[in-house]
Amino acid sequence: SVVGIDLGFLNCYIAVARSGGIETIANEYSDRCTPACISLGSRSQIVTNVRNTIHGFKKIRLPYELQKMPNGSTGVKVRLKVLATTFDPYLGGRVEPPLKSVMDQANLQREDINSIEIVGGATRIPAVKEQVTRFFLKDISTTLNADEAVARNHPAPFSKSIDLPIQSSLYRNAVEEYVYDFRDKFITPEDMNKYGQPIQMKYVEHEERPK
């Protein structure tokens, strides 16, 4: 004899094939339909008997590993081996769209920009620097470290200086001071995802630094 089971979400059908033909198994719950949700000690299904109901048993054995997502849903865990030579161009390709967006928001052209300074971990990726250089048609600078960026209140990895820093020496109380006139415009994260990564960028203009 051969037993065949047709598993549905709430119901299933069990049939036995013998030499005389195929017989669909009947049961006490219904004539020939067997619930896919099994309630222990009760005929009620999952809607009215959640505590004692076993459901989804047909999905216990899976050819992949499930992963709980931050929003509470269930995802599939995937492992992928990618060479840096393949991944870097893909990552670099995601740099240009936000740059275009903020340039449009600021109503600026490439020729309006004198210097480009980028900070952050992504500046170590050659493909990212190459994409930024190609977009602005200018060499970029990475001399500004993260601590200095925080001290200058840089809110995002990509910053744009309209004018180069102007250094002038002033003698005040016999002490030489260096005054930098920075007029900066920034690309700032307008919204962040659960991982702290920007999902939408916004162009803002900051006030001039006090002298």
Curated annotation (Swiss-Prot):
PROSITE patterns: HSP70_3
Keywords from the UniProt entry: ATP-binding, Chaperone, Cytoplasm, Nucleotide-binding, Nucleus, Phosphoprotein, Stress response
Subunit structure: Homodimer.
Modified residues (Phosphoserine): S161
Protein name as it appears in the record: Heat shock 70 kDa protein 4L
Organism: Mesocricetus auratus
Job description of the protein: Possesses chaperone activity in vitro where it inhibits aggregation of citrate synthase.
Family: Belongs to the heat shock protein 70 family.
Intracellular or extracellular location(s): Cytoplasm; Nucleus
